[in-house]
């Protein structure tokens, strides 16, 4: 077979990868089908809660894949990967909060509910632009990448390695956690960002949206795995 697809070429000598990705593809298909097309009163129906949990597992698998790339292939034990993962998550959450508009508890079209509760009069400057999905999705990738570059530059330039680098990465995560937990930081404090309504115009409570997000997460996980290979 001379005209093999790029995916098949990458996985040609990766039997384990083919088995895992194929199994996940079957699981995602079966779960999606049983959620959308099997009657709710059927024993074969899979709940939307299960769909959501599976989507979270796949998202965490993507995080584990990133950690494996840094630790398993480069030999750098990072205990702070959760920090970069969280920054991307907060970026998406900020976009989702901006989509709520006047549908919040306080009905303020410009400020999220927690900002109204905190008696803020205007939107913090770092929230601007997150009502635009293209800007938001760009920042979701750019902000963690910039932080990782700056942190890595100073760490490796200072020749910090081994367990000392691991401790520093853990300290970075803890410092960011303390910062985000502060109510005056503008990120919802220890309650976080909640009460999302929709994403790109699709109702987040709809079964079809949850299944769509599950499939997209699986595709990104597959893409991430292929890039790592």
Regions picked out by a protein language model, each given a short descriptive name:
Residues 1-229:
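Transmembrane alpha-helices and adjacent helix-loop boundaries
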């Amino acid at each position: 077979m001379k005209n093999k697809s790029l995916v098949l070429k990458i996985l040609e000598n990766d039997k384990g990868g083919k088995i895992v990705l194929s199994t996940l593809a079957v699981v995602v298909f079966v779960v999606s089908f049983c959620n959308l097309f099997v009657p709710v009163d059927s024993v074969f129906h899979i709940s939307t809660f299960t769909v959501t949990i599976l989507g979270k597992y796949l998202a965490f698998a993507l995080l584990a894949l990133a950690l494996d790339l840094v630790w398993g292939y480069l030999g750098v034990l990072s205990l702070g990967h959760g920090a970069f993962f969280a920054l991307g998550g907060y970026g998406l959450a900020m976009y989702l909060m901006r989509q709520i508009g006047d549908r919040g508890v306080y009905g303020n079209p410009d400020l999220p509910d927690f900002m109204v509760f905190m008696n803020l009069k205007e939107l913090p400057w770092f929230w601007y632009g997150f009502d635009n999905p293209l800007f938001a999705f760009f920042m979701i990738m750019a902000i963690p990448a910039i932080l990782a570059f700056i942190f890595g530059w100073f760490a490796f330039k200072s020749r910090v390695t081994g367990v000392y680098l691991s401790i520093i990465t853990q300290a970075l995560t803890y410092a960011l956690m303390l910062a985000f937990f502060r109510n005056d930081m503008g990120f919802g404090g220890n309650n976080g960002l909640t009460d999302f309504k929709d994403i790109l115009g699709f109702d987040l409570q709809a079964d079809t949206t949850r299944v769509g997000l599950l499939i997209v997460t699986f595709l990104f996980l597959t893409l991430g795995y292929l890039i790592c290979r």
